[in-house]
Regions:
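A short acidic, helix-capping loop that chelates divalent metal ions and anchors anionic groups
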Residues: 1-5, 67-69
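Conserved C-terminal portion of the radical SAM core fold
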Residues: 10-158
Length: 159
């Protein structure tokens, strides 16, 4: 997922750099995850990796643009995320160099659970992804990484 969200990066190289940086005596490192539609299904793997490597994880939620926020998540995706993340214990750092408040997993899951799926926002999200991928001919399409994001069968409460 890292290579998709941060086009041009290499996850294996980044892993080695982060772990090496964290192990140096004079430095502290926080990993910051911002929950958004394109990456939400990779959160569980990131949280697990941070836990395995004893790295604190700060979190936020995208609200703007709205098509990357929780209201663009299909209902079955919300359920998948809730199921995978319910038991995660994540060390949320409070040392944010940001104006935005970090949130814990419980609050993030609550925000996702309370959100109402909006088909128009989901359509905007898909148009954004199409635009994003159009300038990156060698990128693996998001539909191949997370095809379930594109499955809209049996959505309840469509707006």
């Amino acid at each position: 997922m890292q290579e998709y969200a941060r086009y041009g990066s290499d996850w294996k190289t980044l892993q080695n750099n982060l772990i090496g940086f964290e192990r140096s005596d004079s430095r502290n490192l926080d990993i910051t995850y911002v929950a958004q539609t394109a990456t939400i299904l990779g959160f569980h793997d990131l949280a697990k990796w941070c836990k395995e490597n004893d790295l604190p994880l700060s979190m936020g939620v995208v609200n703007n643009p709205d098509y990357l926020g929780p209201n663009s998540l299909p209902n079955h995706i919300k359920q998948m995320v809730l199921k995978k993340c319910t038991d995660i214990k994540v060390d949320v750092s409070q040392n944010m160099l940001s104006d935005y408040e970090s949130v814990d997993v419980k609050k993030m899951l609550h925000n996702i659970e309370r959100s109402k799926f909006n088909l128009a926002l989901h359509d905007k999200f898909k148009r954004y992804i199409k635009w994003y991928e159009s300038s990156k001919p060698d990128i693996t399409p998001l539909i191949d990484i997370f095809p379930e994001l594109y499955d809209l069968d049996n959505q309840q409460g469509l707006v």
